[in-house]
């Protein structure tokens, strides 16, 4: 299991394959996605890598956050996320993950926050059919109708589908195929739609239900600030010391 990445949704477009097939894709941008910290068994009880992406002005970051980023020697980040990984898959702190972390043809799971729709009725929120257009129905054509029984059970059960707030929830879309990667511009194009609005933050990880291609880099594709890349295991030992 490898670490995922934090990306930003650019928008949707389409591309054409060599065979002339039209493929709708969502473009994700991976920019300044760096390892901020490690989570170890000794200190935290689990193993994970914490990533940060996006740039923030130091004046807009709390003192505690500035200290956290200073320890990792990275600039303040806009978005933080953790990815559970085994110890051998840890990436050194300060390393920047690049777009070729994923290879063309592999499948990924994408997590984002859906677009908020505000208060919505039953027909829009749950695809209810509504009431009849005529035959005694007036005004309440889009009503949801009855919500329960009579004296027995004498109540409306919990989780009954009703009008209410729609959208603005965390959703994971599984098994999206990577169609293209552009390392220079930090772009990843995946087939299909991705939850959220343009500019929203997205986490991308290897698909759980699909096999990881053999050519996928392990523990990942990244570049270090220094001239030499230290093994991930050594980075864990240094942080745990």
From Swiss-Prot:
Molecular functions (GO terms): rRNA binding; structural constituent of ribosome
Residues recorded as bearing N5-methylglutamine in the entry: 151
UniProt keyword RNA-binding, yes or no: yes
Assigned keywords, A-Z: Methylation, Ribonucleoprotein, Ribosomal protein, RNA-binding, rRNA-binding
Post-translational modification: Methylated by PrmB.
Listed GO CC annotations: cytosolic large ribosomal subunit
GO biological process: translation
Signal peptide: none
InterPro entries with a match to the protein in the record: Ribosomal_uL3, Ribosomal_uL3_bac/org-type, Ribosomal_uL3_CS, Transl_B-barrel_sf
Region span, Disordered: 140-168, 216-241
Assembly behavior: Part of the 50S ribosomal subunit. Forms a cluster with proteins L14 and L19.
Similarity section: Belongs to the universal ribosomal protein uL3 family.
Biological role stated in the UniProt entry: One of the primary rRNA binding proteins, it binds directly near the 3'-end of the 23S rRNA, where it nucleates assembly of the 50S subunit.
Database matches in HAMAP family: Ribosomal_uL3_B
Protein name: Large ribosomal subunit protein uL3
UniProt source species: Xanthobacter autotrophicus (strain ATCC BAA-1158 / Py2)
């Amino acid at each position: 299991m490898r670490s995922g990445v934090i990306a930003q949704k650019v928008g949707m477009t389409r591309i054409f394959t060599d065979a002339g097939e039209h493929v709708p894709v969502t473009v994700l941008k991976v920019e300044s996605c760096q390892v901020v910290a490690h989570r170890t068994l000794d200190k935290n009880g689990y193993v994970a890598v914490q990533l940060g992406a996006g740039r923030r002005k130091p004046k807009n970051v709390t003192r505690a956050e500035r200290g956290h980023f200073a320890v990792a020697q990275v600039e303040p980040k806009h978005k933080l996320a953790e990815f559970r990984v085994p110890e051998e898959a840890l990436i050194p702190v300060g390393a920047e993950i690049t777009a070729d972390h994923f290879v063309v043809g592999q499948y990924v799971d994408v997590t984002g926050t859906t677009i908020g729709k505000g208060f919505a009725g039953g027909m829009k929120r749950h695809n209810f059919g509504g009431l009849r257009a005529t035959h005694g129905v007036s005004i309440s054509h889009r009503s949801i109708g009855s919500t329960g029984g009579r004296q027995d059970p004498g109540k409306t059960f919990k989780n009954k589908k009703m009008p209410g707030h729609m959208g603005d929830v965390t959703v994971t879309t599984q098994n999206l195929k990577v169609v293209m990667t552009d390392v220079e511009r930090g772009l990843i194009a995946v087939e299909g739609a991705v939850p959220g609005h343009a500019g929203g933050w997205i986490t991308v990880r290897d698909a759980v239900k699909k096999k990881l291609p053999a050519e996928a880099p392990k523990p990942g594709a990244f570049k270090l600030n220094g001239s030499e890349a230290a093994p991930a295991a050594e980075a864990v030992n240094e942080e745990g010391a």
